Amino acid sequence: LTGGWTPRPSGNEAWSQSPSSGAFETQDGLLMVAANNDKQFRALCAGLGRPDILEDARWKEAPCRAKNAPELRAELVRIFLSRPALEWERVLDEAGVPAAKVRSLDETLAEPHAATRAFTHTMHWDRQPHDFHVPTLGFKVDGEVIAPTTPPPANQALKPYG
């Protein structure tokens, strides 16, 4: 917002453009991995059970990894396809590598953290056959969740337009 530049869309790839970061297919879905620096890359190789990758001249140093990115990426894809995303999430977390299964909205909202943070608020509106959920703000004020308490005033807002 204050840097004077607008980032370009990067799709599923990490902003760092590191070949060992970004979205990887697993047996059952996507896994986001952020192994952007040498320390994280070494931890990634250890977590994958593939310390031999570090001995390959194509990938030993960061500039070499960048130069040989397609080959490294292909090797990592082959490895990640061998297990489910949640298993990789656990293994890489233990290795100290930032990584997480890409969850659907339903999966995300079912996480204990989402309930603790009260990411949604249940509302009742007599025009709806059942209660519905709306998002709250991502923070609390004086320990309280900030959430809408009444439905939007649609009729009032649209009345001037017919």
Language-model segments: residues:
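Short low-complexity, flexible loop/linker segments enriched in glycine and/or proline
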Residues: 114-120
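Conserved PLP cofactor-binding pocket of PLP-dependent enzymes
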Residues: 93-114
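Aromatic-enriched alpha-helical interface/lid elements that frame and gate functional surfaces
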Residues: 15, 19-95, 99, 161
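Generic alpha-helical structural context detector
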Residues: 2, 42-46, 106, 139
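Short acidic-hydrophobic surface loop/beta-edge motif
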Residues: 22-26, 120-126
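Short, glycine-/Ser/Thr-/acidic-enriched flexible segments
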Residues: 38-39, 107, 146
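Flexible, small-/acidic-enriched active-site or ligand-binding loops
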Residues: 124-162
